[in-house]
């Protein structure tokens, strides 16, 4: 029985194609059962994230099964026949290696990201619960999880923040340590505010306030990140009690200056204040960094730190590939589970 991976991802298909084939999480079980019922498919696992949709299946007639799976997707109102060109197929050891690279974050849009490991685990557990796996799929995925974990523990592929939002969070943790109880003020309700706000909330920040000229947008963002919307004309009243400020408005001038902060120092008891300026033009005057307890990072500095982390991760790829090759030889001493 041969293991096959049939799918598309961020490298082979743009988002407007990927979204047509995406399988919502609440439909993964049903989709797995439908694919398992196709001719030639003996076992299967369906993985669907924002950046990929993949079918891992086992078959004694893999080419025949692949035709039926493609027909299922393309003939299900999701695409035309020429969309088959967006799909890739890996068989045998190549399919196993691909699964291990996916689990390790080597095949992710953000190299080394960790979320995919949990997403694959969820996909496998759903398939297991749906009764569409058997010995080959179960043993292969369990061993692949071990390999994926080994790559992460024996390499630095996941080290360092690679997005502006995650860099900002890491810097905040360097200043405050545990972010539990940290109070945050977000100025602006765009994409950068959302990403950074979510990252801070995920690390334990509490009392997140969102101010935007459009109060409706502030309410919307606050709802996404567990925060509270406040009117834009009163955000200055909150600075005395805030630990972190994320500035990302469209204002054409600085809205936080030395004159804004100096009168507040005593009432703040000279507590540390972390300012994240991710707006262009800048929202925070650079000279506020001269205030002893103020830490200011702008978009250029954050981007530079993220780029350095990306370069560092790329240098780890060959090491990770070697770990995967060696681990496949160790954990799969024969090819019975994926290529027989």
From Swiss-Prot:
The active site is at residue 50. GO terms for biological process: protoporphyrinogen IX biosynthetic process from glutamate. Its EC number is 1.2.1.70. Substrate binds at residues 49-52, 108, 113-115, 119. Keywords: NADP, Oxidoreductase, Porphyrin biosynthesis. Transmembrane segments: none annotated. Pfam families: GlutR_N, Shikimate_DH. Pathway: Porphyrin-containing compound metabolism; protoporphyrin-IX biosynthesis; 5-aminolevulinate from L-glutamyl-tRNA(Glu): step 1/2. Possesses an unusual extended V-shaped dimeric structure with each monomer consisting of three distinct domains arranged along a curved 'spinal' alpha-helix. The N-terminal catalytic domain specifically recognizes the glutamate moiety of the substrate. The second domain is the NADPH-binding domain, and the third C-terminal domain is responsible for dimerization. Catalyzes the NADPH-dependent reduction of glutamyl-tRNA(Glu) to glutamate 1-semialdehyde (GSA). Homodimer. During catalysis, the active site Cys acts as a nucleophile attacking the alpha-carbonyl group of tRNA-bound glutamate with the formation of a thioester intermediate between enzyme and glutamate, and the concomitant release of tRNA(Glu). The thioester intermediate is finally reduced by direct hydride transfer from NADPH, to form the product GSA. Belongs to the glutamyl-tRNA reductase family. This is Glutamyl-tRNA reductase. It comes from Akkermansia muciniphila (strain ATCC BAA-835 / DSM 22959 / JCM 33894 / BCRC 81048 / CCUG 64013 / CIP 107961 / Muc).
